[in-house]
Amino acid sequence: MKLQKPKGTQDILPPESAKWQYVEGFAREIFKRYNYAEVRTPIFEHYEVISRSVGDTTDIVTKEMYDFYDKGDRHITLRPEGTAPVVRSYVENKLFAPEVQKPSKFYYMGPMFRYERPQAGRLRQFHQIGVECFGSSNPATDVETIAMAAHFLKEIGIQGVKLHLNTLGNPESRAAYRQALIDYLTPLKETLSKDSQRRLEENPLRVLDSKEKEDKEAVENAPSILDFLDEESQAHFDAVRQMLENLGVDYIIDTNMVRGLDYYNHTIFEFITEIEGNDLTVCAGGRYDGLVSYFGGPETAGFGFGLGVERLLLILEKQGVTLPIENALDVYIAVLGEGANIKALELVQALRQQGFKAERDYLNRKLKAQFKSADVFVAKTLITLGESEVESGQVTVKNNQTREEVQVSLETISQNFSEIFEKLGFYTQ
């Protein structure tokens, strides 16, 4: 049997992995500016954590979950999204306690799992970066979080992004709209896709989100949620829109956008960009004020978003965006002769301990092959260390781009290479 990765997964290898590290590091830097701290939750949860919060009737739960019974007969699922595990952790660890600063701001990043048809930018094991903010029902929190997502997408280089905005109102507004939608769609039931006929019975708002042609035609003249907002819901949505305008964040009202998870209320949003004629959602989220209490905590407001790393990288690639990744070696040591082996090891270690990215030859190859390796590694400087250099204690350090050389002692390299590095035209951090 040929051993290979499971369908819908990938090996992320160098140099591709450097792009992942850059995106993750960039996200951490942006989130830190907004006072978010990292939280790490298990990749598997009790089945009920996901099914009850995401919604028993959602596609995630009915079709896409990886769930199983473990050896203790506990019903376990691999996490298909990030919000429910973070909320479970928030409640379990009593982060709602008075001594914990509010609002509480967390971010996460890591693998998620859904059993769906693998395609470009969508895998069965995929990676998500997300944020969750607890304890503020202020519409300014909605806007700050949306603005943070916009800030991240703009600075990382995504082009042509449009913010789609909607509201689901409070539970009362949503219930009134739900009934109006049922009344509108029931006479059209036979024209809907099989999935949407099922959704009409279980969660009619999801019909609005369908990508099927017949469903899109059916909802073209459907009632709008904006006509069913009560005073509180309308005031919240108006405030969100006004503050976005104050910050100069453009948006499009999209009343057919409902998001695929049942826990949202009030503001929901998606950042969408067009790639090769197709609209791709790069980041999405919204408000979920009832989820913490649903998990057994006190009534607590919540707001967050998630974005898929695979999709983000796909969009950057399609848009021709090159991430500023530093791959170059600072120093490469070419080693000539067995007598130089130990000194080369001491030297490369001393360079690394001074903060330089350094490598040496270990394969006893001809110098020409070692110089080629230095070029492949885009080494800034090159040291050739043979037995005669070890005996004399002197060595030549070459700028591998300009070919400029300086003669220095091995002791200087071991103790103060930054002086030589700068003399050859490079600058240390």
Curated annotation (Swiss-Prot):
It comes from the Bacteria. Keywords: Aminoacyl-tRNA synthetase, ATP-binding, Cytoplasm, Ligase, Nucleotide-binding, Protein biosynthesis. It is an enzyme of class 6 (ligase). The keyword Glycosyltransferase does not apply. Gene3D superfamilies: Anticodon-binding domain, Bira Bifunctional Protein, Domain 2. One of its GO terms (cellular component) is cytoplasm. Its EC number is 6.1.1.21. It is found in: Cytoplasm. It catalyses: tRNA(His) + L-histidine + ATP = L-histidyl-tRNA(His) + AMP + diphosphate + H(+). GO terms for molecular function: ATP binding; catalytic activity, acting on a protein; histidine-tRNA ligase activity; transferase activity. GO terms for biological process: histidyl-tRNA aminoacylation. InterPro entries: aa-tRNA-synth_II (IPR006195), aa-tRNA-synth_II/BPL/LPL (IPR045864), Anticodon-bd (IPR004154), Anticodon-bd_dom_sf (IPR036621), His-tRNA-ligase (IPR015807), HisRS-like_core (IPR041715), HisRS/HisZ (IPR004516), HisRS_anticodon (IPR033656). Its main location: cytoplasm. Belongs to the class-II aminoacyl-tRNA synthetase family. Homodimer. PANTHER family: HISTIDINE--TRNA LIGASE, MITOCHONDRIAL-RELATED, HISTIDYL-TRNA SYNTHETASE. This is Histidine--tRNA ligase. It comes from Streptococcus pneumoniae (strain CGSP14). The gene is hisS.
